[in-house]
Amino acid sequence: MKLIAGLGNPGKKYERTRHNVGFMVVDELSFRHQTPWKKSKFNGMTSEIIVGGEKMILVKPLTFMNASGECIRPLMDYYNIPIEDVVIVYDDLDLPVGKIRLRQKGSAGGHNGMKSIIQHVKTQEFNRIRVGVSRPLKGEVIHYVLGDFPKAEQPDIIAAIQKSADAIEDYAQTPFIEVMNKYNQK
């Protein structure tokens, strides 16, 4: 069993924002597998998919981005999922829109959702998929990440969401390092 957490903020006003690209990836997986979302007792929404016989628990924390670890850690404990079977999907300002990067470990890189998860799981050594949203040319980052993708960027972000979902489906049957090597070359 694997836990796939997409990071974002709950609520209609954040639904299509750059910061919610993690939610968009797990929503894509839920859509592909036609599985419903259910409210979890751990302050998140969960959906279960089966890929190649492997059960994957999808989660969207409802804690708001900066407290994502408050949802992830209890779910790991409840389902007895070890850290090596967890994947966190989140937005990355340092990658261009449409690019994805898979990593097995690393720092939070200034991302508050990742800081919260690292604090709660007490390690930086877990799988992650970073989805590029680019940096603003000027202005505050907070307004930028809480803004929607402009029309010109939508084809690139849709492709990145689909590629991220493909990588997660591959991970059901393939070690993460192999999935990482495959998708980081594209």
Swiss-Prot record:
- Classify the source by domain of life: Bacteria
Could you tell me which InterPro entries the record lists for this protein? Pept_tRNA_hydro, Pept_tRNA_hydro_CS, Pept_tRNA_hydro_sf
- What are the recorded Gene Ontology BP terms? protein quality control for misfolded or incompletely synthesized proteins; rescue of stalled ribosome
Q: Where is this site: Discriminates between blocked and unblocked aminoacyl-tRNA?
A: N9
Q: EC number(s)? A: 3.1.1.29
Q: What is its main location?
A: cytoplasm
Kindly list the GO molecular function terms attached to this UniProt entry.
peptidyl-tRNA hydrolase activity; tRNA binding
Q: Which residues bind tRNA?
A: Y14, F64, N66, N112
Location comes to: Cytoplasm
According to UniProt, the reaction catalysed is: an N-acyl-L-alpha-aminoacyl-tRNA + H2O = an N-acyl-L-amino acid + a tRNA + H(+)
- Active site (UniProt): H19 (proton acceptor)
GO cellular component terms, semicolon-separated: cytoplasm
Which keywords fit this entry according to its UniProt record? Cytoplasm, Hydrolase, RNA-binding, tRNA-binding
Q: Where is this site: Stabilizes the basic form of H active site to accept a proton?
A: D91
What the record says about family reads: Belongs to the PTH family.
* HAMAP family hit by this protein: Pept_tRNA_hydro_bact
Role played: Hydrolyzes ribosome-free peptidyl-tRNAs (with 1 or more amino acids incorporated), which drop off the ribosome during protein synthesis, or as a result of ribosome stalling.
NCBIfam families the record matches: pth
How does the record describe its quaternary structure?
Answer: Monomer.
The molecule here is called Peptidyl-tRNA hydrolase
| Natural source organism | Listeria monocytogenes serotype 4a (strain HCC23)
